[in-house]
Amino acid sequence: MSEPQRLKPVFPQDPKWPGEGSSRVPFWAYTREDLYKRELERLFYANHWCYVGLEAEIPNPGDFKRTVIGERSVIMVRDPDGGINVVENVCAHRGMRFCRERHGNAKDFFCPYHQWNYSLKGDLQGVPFRRGVKQDGKVNGGMPKDFKLEEHGLTKLKVAARGGAVFASFDHDVEPFEEFLGPTILHYFDRVFNGRKLKILGYRRQRIPGNWKLMQENIKDPYHPGLLHTWFSTFGLWRADNKSELKMDAKFRHAAMISTRGQGGKNEEVVSGVDSFKEQMKVNDPRLLDIVPEPWWGGPTAVMTTIFPSVIIQQQVNSVSTRHIQPNGHGSFDFVWTHFGFEDDNEEWTQRRLIQANLFGPAGFVSADDGEVIEWSQEGFEQKPTHRTVIEMGGHEIGDTDHMVTETLIRGMYDYWRKVMGE
């Protein structure tokens, strides 16, 4: 009679990564709050560029957008000289988050608590009662004589604007943005942000109860779309028999999933036994799939580009958007979609992009599935942190491929994550 297996603790005190490589990811990588804080420090607040917005969101002097990097609130603002600045939304006096509006226009910033006033470049320019108050022949209060305005401005971030997209970093020693992306991913970035003026079409926002890395994984995972998503498998938008490529940067942190739409329909090789394939499904509004090739595509009908750690750039047929990942604790993140077109689009093109955008977002015909499976995955991780995922489709290796039946991009991401996090 064989010996009964010894039970492993469900909540290990000093957990260790299960072996070499990145094809087995422990559940505790998604559940440990101490690890999450380290991720914020090493991935969002140092050594990385993070997405903050699009120039088209702040076209005029004084226009601003409040957003976040990691959990730190920041403001992207266009100054009177036309420059783009990103400053932290924390008053230098008593630490209040002074900006409450998501979008607006301002001549300057001030904190309502004590009325400290800042320029749009983040410089402190006014302190009430700085020189005290005269009363009965004497001066009461006031700031010390050695108090200097220039030493008490808002925290200023380093800014990189390219092709209409804006990234920022708290780390002023971060590598140049182009080097951060690397030539392969920069090519796909420039494919979307190619210098044409952008036009904002709208926003979607959702809170997903799952670890933020799961959304990066989801868009680095070509294995699931043709299995999970009815729309993708039935109409050939994204499935295993599409012509495709997967590409990464040299450090494996960023990736591009590149696909050319197939004809859909019943290919037994890829739809046999697949529940998401609905042979009889038809669209009531054919405009949803009224796809017109655009010259800038250069062939592929879809490219999903993940820029680690903060954003996904989506081109899925004629729908174009950024998807901003905003962590909110180890088990939750906000996911903000900015849908856009181009300034030279006519009304017909704008409507086409808006209609196709219904595939995406929290109630989208495709993306609603992703939000649910991320939530349910997090529930499983919290239940038994000592267990691990299996990321072995396509083997254990990490590298570019010319097919989608693989999890190589996820293995690449965790190879990089382990090096940075020291796990």
Curated annotation (Swiss-Prot):
UniProt pathway: Aromatic compound metabolism; naphthalene degradation
Cross-referenced SUPFAM superfamilies: Bet v1-like (SSF55961), ISP domain (SSF50022)
Rieske domain boundaries: 49-168
Domain of life the protein comes from: Bacteria
Region ranges (Disordered): 1-20
Pfam families: Rieske, Ring_hydroxyl_A
GO cellular component, one term: catalytic complex
InterPro entries, A to Z: AhdA1c-like_alpha_C (IPR043264), Rieske_2Fe-2S (IPR017941), Rieske_2Fe-2S_sf (IPR036922), Ring-hydroxy_dOase_2Fe2S_BS (IPR015881), Ring_hydroxy_dOase_asu_C_dom (IPR015879), Rng_hydr_dOase-A (IPR001663)
A GO term for molecular function: 2 iron, 2 sulfur cluster binding
Residues that coordinate or bind [2Fe-2S] cluster: 91, 93, 111, 114
GO biological process, one term: salicylic acid catabolic process
Named cofactor requirement(s): Fe cation; [2Fe-2S] cluster
EC number(s) from the headed UniProt entry: 1.14.13.172
This protein's UniProt keywords: 2Fe-2S, Aromatic hydrocarbons catabolism, Iron, Iron-sulfur, Metal-binding, Monooxygenase, NAD, Oxidoreductase, Plasmid
Catalytic activity, as annotated: salicylate + NADH + O2 + H(+) = 2,5-dihydroxybenzoate + NAD(+) + H2O
Cofactor comment: Binds 1 Fe cation per subunit. Binds 1 [2Fe-2S] cluster per subunit.
Enzyme class (EC, first level): oxidoreductase
Family recorded in the similarity comment: Belongs to the bacterial ring-hydroxylating dioxygenase alpha subunit family.
Described function: Oxygenase component of the salicylate 5-hydroxylase (S5H) multicomponent enzyme system which catalyzes the 5-hydroxylation of salicylate to gentisate. Active only on substrates with a ring-substituted carboxylate group with an adjacent hydroxyl group. Primarily active against salicylate and substituted salicylates, but not against 2-hydroxycinnamate, 3-hydroxycinnamate, 2-hydroxyphenylacetate, 3-hydroxyphenylacetate, 2-hydroxybenzophenone, 1-hydroxy-2-naphthoate, 4-methoxysalicylate or 2-hydroxyacetophenone.
Subunit and interaction comment: The salicylate 5-hydroxylase (S5H) multicomponent enzyme system is composed of an electron transfer component and an oxygenase component. The electron transfer component is comprised of a ferredoxin reductase (NagAa) and a ferredoxin (NagAb), and the oxygenase component is formed by a large subunit (NagG) and a small subunit (NagH).
PANTHER family attached to this UniProt entry: CHOLINE MONOOXYGENASE, CHLOROPLASTIC
Name under which the protein is recorded: Salicylate 5-hydroxylase, large oxygenase component
Organism the protein comes from: Ralstonia sp
Native organism taxonomy: Bacteria, Pseudomonadati, Pseudomonadota, Betaproteobacteria, Burkholderiales
Gene: nagG
